[in-house]
């Protein structure tokens, strides 16, 4: 079948009843919703609870008959978390002209929220994972690979980890922003966008896939071929407004609250690149562990971020790929990644000395070579997923 694997969405009628009864709290209403309404209330009223599908009376038997390699989803759906509602545009709304009124008088907009797609597996182990993408990316990066294999969300779903895949505010399916006009164009597009929009070649070099596209570094795990590179570049997702780390962290805090209300469990927070920098600012109350994949930086010892993580006792592991210590010295990005890696090592040393729990994994030291900044999309992404799963198990999160 497509992408070489089967996704079976199975839920017997009895399971539907039991899960609905056991999940009385769902992600709460975002600002502007009627008081007391919840996401579950809204979906239940419309008969759309989690876009669920059922296989009446066949769940247990089918589960026994199907290979363990098949991904079986009990429930899936989408919701938004956080965000604000803009003040009404000056003037009175006229329903007779509605969208033809270019003044937008009386209109409001729901903006700057995060959007979440979730999947809960039949073998849910009670340790949900919240995934946050990096710069120029969306949740798609966790869900597949450039050559069409299973992404990390599928690999961890098979291990029993529910997936909550985030598009951060002003990105992807969370594109509505206060800096956007009602017709979908940025008020500040001309002056803001061109200054920080790398092209394909710049991404390729900075992400350590190869020196210049389409060549790959020797021993690279990045998928081979023109089609894989084409698919990778087409994952790139622009911002619809200015990046705001404080705003993003608040929205992710709301996501964590919603996941806790929905599952009754704290979440493992898996971040990547720019998302890693945001991740350190997210409120910690509903986070059980952090897995940071080449984060854009790490907290300074003694900082507010650092103390918050330390006091919460959150275990942290930080992963780095190849071509850092051995990267081309004439490429400025090599120095950047060396500094980021060294900063992470210093963070871990301080965090552990102060009673915390942090490991920094440099994959070549583990005998895992050839990985770029996108290790979760490369040909050995399953090997790295297993490595992380072993760490989670060592923390009792399995």
Identify the role of each PLM range.
Residues 59-124:
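N-terminal cap/lid segment of alpha/beta-hydrolase-fold proteins
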Residues 126-134:
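Short beta-strand element of the alpha/beta-hydrolase
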Residues 133-145, 296:
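Active-site glycine-rich loops that stabilize anionic/oxyanionic intermediates
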Residues 149-174:
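Conserved alpha/beta-hydrolase
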Residues 246-267:
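Conserved acidic catalytic loop of the alpha/beta-hydrolase fold
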Residues 270-279:
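Gly/Ala-rich beta-loop-alpha elbow adjacent to hydrolase catalytic centers
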Residues 292-363:
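The feature captures the conserved acid-bearing segment of alpha/beta-hydrolase catalytic domains
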Residues 374-398:
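Catalytic active-site module of serine/aspartate enzymes centered on a nucleophile-bearing elbow/loop
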């Amino acid at each position: 079948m497509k992408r070489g694997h089967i996704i079976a969405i199975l839920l017997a009628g009895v399971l539907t009843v039991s899960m609905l009864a056991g999940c009385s709290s769902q992600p709460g209403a975002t600002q502007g919703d009627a008081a007391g309404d919840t996401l579950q209330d809204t979906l239940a009223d419309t008969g759309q609870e989690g876009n669920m599908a059922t296989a009446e009376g066949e769940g247990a038997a089918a589960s026994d008959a199907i290979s363990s390699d098949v991904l079986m989803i009990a429930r899936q759906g989408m919701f938004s978390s956080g965000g604000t509602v803009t003040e009404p545009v000056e003037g009175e709304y006229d329903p007779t002209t509605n969208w033809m009124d270019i003044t937008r008088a009386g209109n409001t907009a729901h903006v700057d929220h995060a959007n979440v797609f979730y999947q809960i597996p039949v073998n849910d182990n009670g340790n949900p994972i919240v995934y946050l993408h990096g710069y120029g990316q969306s949740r798609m990066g966790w869900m597949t690979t450039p050559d069409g294999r299973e992404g990390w969300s599928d690999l961890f779903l098979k291990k029993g980890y529910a997936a909550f895949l985030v598009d951060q505010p002003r990105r992807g399916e969370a594109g509505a922003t206060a800096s956007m006009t009602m017709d979908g164009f940025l008020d500040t597009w001309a002056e803001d966008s061109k200054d920080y929009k790398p092209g394909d070649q710049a991404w390729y070099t900075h992400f350590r896939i190869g020196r210049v596209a389409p060549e790959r570094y020797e021993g690279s795990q990045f998928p081979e071929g023109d089609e894989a590179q084409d698919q990778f570049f087409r994952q790139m997702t622009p911002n619809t407004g200015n990046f705001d780390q404080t705003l993003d962290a608040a929205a992710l805090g709301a996501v964590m609250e919603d996941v806790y209300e929905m599952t009754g469990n704290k979440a493992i927070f898996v971040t990547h690149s720019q998302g890693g920098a945001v991740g350190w600012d997210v409120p910690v109350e509903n986070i059980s562990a952090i897995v940071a994949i080449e984060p854009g930086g790490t907290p300074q010892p003694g900082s507010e971020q650092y103390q918050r993580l330390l006091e919460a006792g959150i275990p942290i592991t930080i992963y780095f790929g190849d071509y850092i210590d051995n990267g081309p010295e004439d490429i400025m990005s090599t120095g950047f990644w060396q500094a980021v890696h060294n900063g992470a090592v210093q963070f871990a040393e301080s965090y552990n000395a102060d009673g915390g729990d942090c490991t920094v994994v440099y994959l070549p030291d583990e005998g895992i070579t050839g990985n770029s900044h996108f290790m979760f999309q490369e040909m050995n992404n399953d090997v790295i997923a297993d490595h992380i799963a072993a760490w989670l198990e060592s923390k009792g999160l399995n």
